[in-house]
């Protein structure tokens, strides 16, 4: 009978650690890397590069989009930091959990139970906080997507050859070209006529087509950004669903852990399974924290 109790306890405890580890591993390998933030950083810089290529109305929308993308990134990394903090707690507690197997007794078993419940409880709390941050991040992406639709409409109007913005750009080009022609004349009035004729040919044959191409490049950039933002929002929504499933699983195993008797006679295989699960989660935490800048890894107890 004692052996059956021990096996049941091992199964519950091992499941508790593995469930928490699974949630962290999911965050580490999927949720935390779902958005290509390096690409987004470059994109945000690109927003400023085109600031001379759209109207004031479009400029306001671009400013709003930039703020929303930066807000989304802030909230996403806020979620990352929350999980980082959980890792810091987990490595310390699981190390203590492993060491408590030495000269095992009922008091140490009770301490182990408290440790696992603390890890699971803190996990639910921290992952829920991360979930809220991801929700806000997703909302900012969604709002940015709406602004990008409005921007596309604005740019379509601006870049129409009949628009006041397009005509103002053409007028600027003409003014600069004719000013250059006048400054370069050396052959009197007839030279001026010839220079203006050349300037007119350059304007209509080269400069205006170049303007059209340049403005098309700007619109294509924002069309591409719109698709990227929509995909990012979709990916975060999928990430939130996965995380919600993991949080629910931790909550369920926490309830089972709370009602499990911990003080049983473990054989060597059982001890190996439990220590192995704990060490694996410590390594997962180390991997996560290292990827987020921690230089010194937590040393896994060699027992």
From Swiss-Prot:
Q: Does the keyword Membrane apply?
A: yes
Q: Where in the cell is it found?
A: Secreted; Periplasm; Host cell membrane
InterPro entries for the chain: Hemolysin_E
- What does the UniProt keyword field contain? Cytolysis, Disulfide bond, Hemolysis, Host cell membrane, Host membrane, Membrane, Periplasm, Secreted, Toxin, Transmembrane, Transmembrane helix, Virulence
One GO BP: symbiont-mediated hemolysis of host erythrocyte
Q: Which Pfam families does the entry mention?
A: HlyE (PF06109)
Please list the GO terms describing molecular function: pore-forming activity; toxin activity
Q: What does the entry's PTM section describe?
A: In periplasm, it forms a disulfide bond, which prevents the oligomerization. In outer membrane vesicles, the redox status prevents formation of the disulfide bond, leading to oligomerization and pore formation.
NCBIfam families the record matches: PRK11376.1 (NF008477)
Q: What does this protein do?
A: Toxin, which has some hemolytic activity towards mammalian cells. Acts by forming a pore-like structure upon contact with mammalian cells.
- Record text on subunit structure and interactions: Monomer and oligomer. In periplasm, it is present as a monomer, while in outer membrane vesicles, it oligomerizes to form a pore structure that is active. The pore is formed by a dodecamer.
Report the family membership: Belongs to the hemolysin E family.
Record's protein name: Hemolysin E
Species name:
Salmonella typhi
């Amino acid at each position: 009978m004692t052996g059956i109790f021990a096996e049941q306890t091992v199964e519950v405890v091992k499941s508790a650690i593995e469930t928490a580890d699974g949630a962290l591993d999911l965050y580490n390998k999927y949720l935390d890397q779902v958005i290509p933030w390096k690409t987004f950083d470059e994109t945000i810089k690109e927003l400023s590069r085109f600031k001379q290529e759209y109207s004031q109305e479009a400029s306001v929308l671009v400013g709003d989009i930039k703020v929303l993308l930066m807000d989304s990134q802030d909230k996403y990394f806020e979620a990352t930091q929350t999980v980082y903090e959980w890792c810091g707690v987990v490595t310390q507690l699981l190390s203590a959990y492993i060491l408590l197997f030495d000269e095992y007794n009922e008091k140490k078993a009770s301490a182990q139970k408290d440790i696992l419940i603390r890890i699971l409880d803190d996990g639910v709390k921290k992952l829920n906080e991360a979930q809220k941050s991801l929700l806000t991040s997703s909302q900012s992406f969604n709002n940015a997507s709406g602004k990008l639709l409005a921007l596309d409409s604005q740019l379509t109007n601006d870049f129409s050859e009949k628009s006041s913005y397009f005509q103002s750009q053409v007028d600027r080009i003409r003014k600069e070209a004719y000013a250059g022609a006048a400054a370069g004349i050396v052959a009197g009035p007839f030279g001026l006529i010839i220079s203006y004729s050349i300037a007119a040919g350059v304007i209509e044959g080269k400069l205006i087509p170049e303007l059209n191409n340049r403005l098309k490049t700007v619109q294509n950039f924002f069309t591409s950004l719109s698709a990227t933002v929509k995909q990012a929002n979709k990916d975060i929504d999928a990430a939130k669903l996965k995380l919600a499933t993991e949080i629910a699983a931790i909550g369920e195993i926490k309830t089972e852990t709370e009602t499990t008797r911990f003080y049983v006679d473990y054989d060597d295989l059982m001890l190996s399974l439990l220590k192995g699960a704990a060490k694996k989660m410590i390594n997962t935490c180390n991997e996560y924290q290292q990827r987020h800048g921690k230089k010194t890894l937590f040393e896994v107890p060699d027992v």
